[in-house]
Regions:
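Serine/proline-rich low-complexity intrinsically disordered segments, especially terminal tails, linkers
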Residues: 8-9, 18-21, 136, 167, ...
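Intrinsically disordered, low-complexity segments enriched in Ser/Pro/Gly/Ala and basic residues
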Residues: 6, 15-18, 128, 235, ...
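Bacterial Sec-dependent N-terminal signal peptides
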Residues: 1-27
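Sequence signature of WD/YWTD-type beta-propeller architectures
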Residues: 214-395
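Intrinsic disorder/low-complexity segments
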Residues: 5, 18-23, 49, 53, ...
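Extracellular glycan-recognition regions
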Residues: 26-218
Length: 395
C-alpha cells in the first residue's frame, strides 16, 4: 500500500465507522428483507408494505428508468453472500401509465444509481429479460427471455452465473443466463420502476422465498439445511409459511377435520394446530424412530407409521389412534425386512406399502387383522409411493 494514500484511507474508514451505526438505525426491516429504499433519487418517494397474514409485499415506486447508465427505482433488499435463489409470484396493480414499467428481482454491488448489477426484469408490455450492467457507469444490456407476461419468476446466482427463469402459473419455466462477476456479497431483492418521473406504479409480490442452496458436498438424509411447513391454495398457487425450523421437518398429513398437520422430525411425530400454531408431540410409545412414511386412515381416526426397529433399523409398520398411544400395534414383521407405509384402504382393513422382499422393492398389501401379505407387483426395479383411490377400486 502506498503511503500517499494513507490519509485518504484513514478518512474513508473513519467515515465508515461513523456512518455504520447511523445506517443501522435507519434500516427498516420488512418481511424477510433488511431494508427498503429509493435508489437513484426518484422525484416521487416509493414505499413498501408487508402483509404478515397473507405474506405478500405491496411495493410502490417511481423512477425514470432502469436503463442506460442510470437507475431509479424502489428496492427491497437483503445483503446476501455467495449463491442464492430468489423466487416470487408477481402482479402489477392496474393498467399502468407506461408500457416499460418494470418489476422483478435484482442483485447489485452497491446502492448507487450506476452500480454494476444483474436482474430478472418483467416489463409492463410483453418483454421479460435478464438486464445487466457489466461495470459501474456502463450502459445497461439485456438477454431477452420471453414475449409474454410471466406470473412466476426465479433469479439464481451460481458463482458468477446469473439465471433468470420465468413461467405463467402451471406452465414450464424458460430460462436465460449471463456470466457477470458481481461482488461476493450483494444487495438482492425486489424492485419496481414506473418508467416515468411523475408517476408511481404498484405491484404485489407473493410466494417470495430466498433460498441458500446446499453446499456441493451436501449429503441427502444426513445433512439438512432447514425446513418450512407451508400450505398452498391449489387453485391460485398462493403459499404461506406456517412454521420454520433449522432441522428437517417432513411429510405433513392434513387431518380430515382440517384442524391439524401431523409431521415427523428426528424420529418423532408432531401435531401442528392450524388455528393456533401450537405444536405438540404425538405419543407413539416406543416407536420413536419414525421415518416420513406415515399415513392417516380415510376416516382420520387412525394413523399408520413406519418405525425403524432394532439395531438393524428395519422399517416396520405400526398403527395407533390419531390421538396417540403408548402401545402402537405392530403390523409387519421386521424379519421380512423393510416396509414403508403409503396408504390405507378406504374401509380401513388393509394397508399398502413398499416392501423389501425377495431381494427387491415391490408394492405389497397386508390384511391388518390376519397380517397376510400379498405382492401386487413383482419387478426388479423399485416400485414406490402407492395410494388407494377414494373408492378403493384402484391403486
Amino acid at each position: 500500500m502506498k503511503l500517499t494514500f494513507c490519509c485518504k484511507l484513514v478518512t474513508v474508514y473513519l467515515l465508515s465507522a461513523l456512518s455504520i451505526p447511523a445506517l443501522r438505525a435507519q434500516l427498516q426491516p420488512i418481511g424477510i428483507f433488511d431494508h427498503h429504499q429509493d435508489v437513484g433519487d426518484p422525484a416521487l418517494k416509493g414505499s413498501a408494505i408487508y402483509d404478515a397474514k397473507e405474506q405478500t409485499y405491496t411495493v410502490t415506486g417511481a423512477g425514470v428508468n432502469m436503463w442506460t447508465n442510470i437507475d431509479q427505482f424502489h428496492f427491497l433488499w437483503k445483503k446476501i453472500k455467495g449463491d442464492f435463489i430468489i423466487r416470487a409470484t408477481i402482479r402489477f396493480i392496474g393498467k399502468g401509465a407506461a408500457e416499460h414499467r418494470k418489476i422483478g428481482v435484482i442483485a447489485r454491488d452497491k446502492l448507487t444509481t450506476d452500480s454494476r448489477y444483474a436482474d430478472a426484469c418483467v416489463h409492463g408490455d410483453i418483454l421479460s429479460s435478464l438486464q445487466y450492467r457489466s461495470t459501474d457507469g456502463a450502459q445497461t444490456e439485456q438477454v431477452e427471455l420471453s414475449s409474454y407476461h410471466p406470473t412466476d419468476i426465479e433469479f439464481q446466482r451460481s458463482g458468477n452465473t446469473f439465471i433468470f427463469s420465468a413461467a405463467t402459473f402451471g406452465e414450464t419455466y424458460k430460462s436465460v443466463k449471463k456470466e457477470l462477476p458481481l461482488n461476493d456479497e450483494v444487495y438482492a431483492g425486489l424492485f419496481i420502476c414506473s418508467h416515468l418521473a411523475d408517476v408511481k406504479e404498484t405491484a404485489v409480490f407473493s410466494n417470495v422465498r430466498i433460498v441458500i442452496p446446499a453446499d456441493s458436498n451436501f449429503r441427502p438424509y444426513r445433512d439438512y439445511i432447514g425446513s418450512h411447513i407451508e400450505v398452498m391454495d391449489v387453485q391460485s398457487g398462493h403459499r404461506k409459511i406456517l412454521h420454520s425450523a433449522p432441522n428437517s421437518l417432513q411429510a405433513p398429513n392434513w387431518t380430515p377435520d382440517g384442524k391439524y398437520l401431523i409431521y415427523n422430525s428426528e424420529g418423532l411425530l408432531y401435531n401442528y394446530e392450524l388455528a393456533t400454531g401450537k405444536i405438540s408431540t404425538l405419543n407413539t410409545g416406543n416407536a420413536n424412530q419414525n421415518n416420513n412414511d406415515h399415513v392417516l386412515s380415510f376416516d382420520g381416526k387412525q394413523i399408520g407409521i413406519s418405525h425403524h426397529v432394532g439395531q438393524r433399523r428395519i422399517s416396520t409398520i405400526f398403527t395407533l389412534p390419531v390421538s396417540g398411544s403408548d402401545q402402537p400395534k405392530q403390523i409387519t414383521m421386521q424379519d421380512t425386512l423393510h416396509s414403508y407405509l403409503h396408504s390405507w384402504s378406504p374401509d380401513g382393513k388393509k394397508l399398502i406399502f413398499t416392501g423389501q422382499r425377495n431381494g427387491q422393492y415391490d408394492i405389497w398389501s397386508i390384511d391388518i387383522a390376519t397380517k397376510k401379505e400379498t405382492a401386487l407387483t413383482q419387478m426388479a426395479t423399485l416400485d414406490d409411493g402407492p395410494e388407494y383411490t377414494p373408492d378403493g377400486k384402484y391403486i
